[in-house]
Amino acid sequence: MSGGFIKGFAHLGAMQALLEHDIKPNIISGVSAGALAGVFYADGNEPHKVLDYFAGHKFQDLTKLVIPKVGLFELSEFKDFLKSNLKAKKLEELQLPLIITATDLDHGRLAHFHKGDIAERVAASCCMPVLFAPVKIDETYYVDGGLLMNLPVSTIRRVCEKVVAINVSPLMAPKYKMNIVSVALRSYNFMFRSNSFPEREKADLLIEPYNLDGYSNRELEKAEEIFMQGYNATNDILERLQIEKGTIWKAVSYTHL
């Protein structure tokens, strides 16, 4: 599951639709918003029930504005939120295997977490540079995994017979504000889109809701609306594939991966 900030709620809607079509994951790979959606599901929650955890919250409830040094916001409140609402505290305690992708800022490489403290690793994967201060884990600083791999299909491709990729960041809004945060986010989105292209081709089923570009990253109050966008788009995609091709799966071979 891809990154996508507030659009990550569409992951939950897509997952809900997939479950209703009897498509259930045995393992989840997520980055940033995808890691957040994935961890709540892997902790035993139905996708539509996850919305309840965020009800009544605003962006500022989960972040802390700081004097800019390495980021405009800290994620301490976000980590506390995760610790308060997840039953599992370590990745290895989850009901379903979850691999979280982050970017190792010190060494310029990908990091794939499958064990350890959940809150720290989800925060690291969601930590978009400039906007958020890097997260330190075991003496290494980490930032948003989407910088190097925004759609982490390769992470689990070898161990899966079928891979469903959900990409909630296929398009960007045509208009943007000329300020430091807006310009930074838009610039990152170019990177996210670019490194997603090769990963898209490795999936057996690709879900891309193309109706999410109008949402602001601070509109947490629209979580349910974004959820429904993902839900409806996924149902439409599955039904169209069945009608046009007779199957939702495409033929993919990765013998040499």
Regions found by a protein language model. Give the residues of each.
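Patatin-like phospholipase
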Residues: M1-V31, V39-L257
